[in-house]
Regions:
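A Rossmann-like FAD-binding core segment of flavoenzymes
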Residues: 74-82, 97, 162-245, 299
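Beta1-alpha1 glycine-rich phosphate/pyrophosphate-binding loop at the start
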Residues: 2-72, 154-182
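A conserved FAD-binding loop/helix module that cradles the flavin
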Residues: 243, 261-314
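FAD-binding core/adjacent interface of flavoenzyme oxidoreductases
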Residues: 1-11, 69-144, 216
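Rossmann-like NAD(P)H-binding beta-loop-alpha module
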Residues: 131, 135-166
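C-terminal auxiliary extensions adjacent to catalytic cores
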Residues: 315-359
Length: 359
């Protein structure tokens, strides 16, 4: 249990309890008086959402199990506004929460056409995996995954393995696995054939163009930065929050930004992609920088490079794509059951790292 005495000026609000926000809160709590604002009572392993769609029972952990030892408070509410002049955050229960330093960690969401719905209720995303699971239980039919990135590939593979009665297909505007090497893409295509997944590459599609009983949209992610925009924070053209090397908003240096909402970059990696693999290091660095700032020390710039991309292709197959520091694929992969086990270990390590930070 943390017993240190907090001092004036160390109130830190963390908006969002995903990978980046939770890690930032745990690191900052070594020196700061930390409050996490998130409507959920549980931390959810977002990288396992495709497993939920295929029937996994639970991917959540009580937030209290991470926060209690470091005396981090949790406000179960949704952020509606940030007032950077008064240094307050407003939540949907109309409460105002003052801060000295703020961590913006509201993540991202799947970007769909229009309001993301269809009149006939056919459209689902990774975020609605539990509802998708219920729909699949209603009976067999046809299901199309839109988007050939890692999220779509994992979703299609997992469902095809678990739901043999359903006819699974994928439609993607470009090549499947655009971030993979040719060897990696070949393995994905071979796996799809083995699982009976029909693949159509080079076809842009809208939901109304698809004749399927169920559509799972995984085509792109969008940062949840609308609240930041309303508060006047500087954003990039693609809607992420501009940050400096220390992960502070370039327009509001008392606001740190982590996770998918941050347009963070390093010399080695370039601009970081939206991923759990980047969210945890961002959260850790922001939290440590807050501690340094409160101790009167100089915050340090983010240091980050890529090593590999890991992908599950069902429970018994996977793909490890080795990459350079800048995330460009090398001509080296690991496949099969060994890759599936490595993927599982990587996923488990994310929760382990949070547990270690919570001690």
């Amino acid at each position: 249990m943390t017993n240190k005495r907090k001092t004036a000026g160390d109130r830190v609000l963390v908006l969002g309890a995903g990978y980046g926000g939770l890690m930032a809160a745990l690191r900052a709590a070594d020196e700061a008086d930390v409050t996490v604002i998130d409507p959920a009572a549980h931390f959810s392993e977002r990288v396992r959402e495709h497993e939920v769609a295929a029937g996994r029972d639970d991917i959540s952990h009580p937030l209290s199990s991470f926060l209690e030892k470091k005396r981090i408070r949790h406000v179960a509410a949704r952020v509606t506004d940030i007032d950077p002049v008064r240094k307050e955050v407003v939540t949907d229960d109309r409460r105002r929460h003052p801060y000295d330093l703020l961590v913006y960690a509201l993540g991202s969401r799947t970007q769909t056409f229009g309001d993301g719905s269809t009149e006939d209720g056919r459209l689902f995303t990774s975020e609605t995996a539990r509802y998708l699971r219920k729909r699949l239980d209603d009976g067999p039919g046809t299901l199309t995954v839109v988007g050939g990135g890692a999220t779509g590939v994992e979703m299609a593979s997992e469902l095809a393995e678990a739901e043999r009665a359903w006819k699974i297909s994928m439609v993607t505007a470009g090549e499947v696995g655009p971030a993979l090497s040719e060897k990696g893409r070949t393995h994905v295509r071979s796996t799809f054939r083995d699982l009976g997944i029909s693949l159509e590459e080079g076809r842009p599609a809208a939901p109304e163009d698809l004749d399927a009983d169920v559509i799972v949209w995984t085509a792109s992610l969008r940062a949840n930065a609308e609240i930041a925009r309303s508060a006047g924070l500087a954003l990039t053209v693609d809607g992420r929050i501009q940050v400096d090397a220390m992960l502070r908003s370039v327009s509001h240096p008392d606001i740190y930004v982590v996770g998918d909402a941050a347009a963070a970059r390093t010399a080695a990696a370039g601009e970081l992609r939206m991923a759990c693999a980047t969210a945890l290091p961002l959260g850790s660095r922001a939290g440590r920088n807050i501690v340094a700032e409160l101790r009167g020390k100089r915050p340090k710039p983010l240091s980050f490079r890529y090593y590999a991309q890991v992908m599950s292709l069902g429970r018994r197959n996977g793909l490890v794509q080795f990459v350079g520091a800048d995330d460009k694929p090398k001509d080296l992969i690991v496949t099969g059951r060994k890759a599936a086990l490595l993927k599982e270990q990587v996923v488990r390590s994310t929760v382990r790292s949070l547990r270690l930070a919570a001690r």
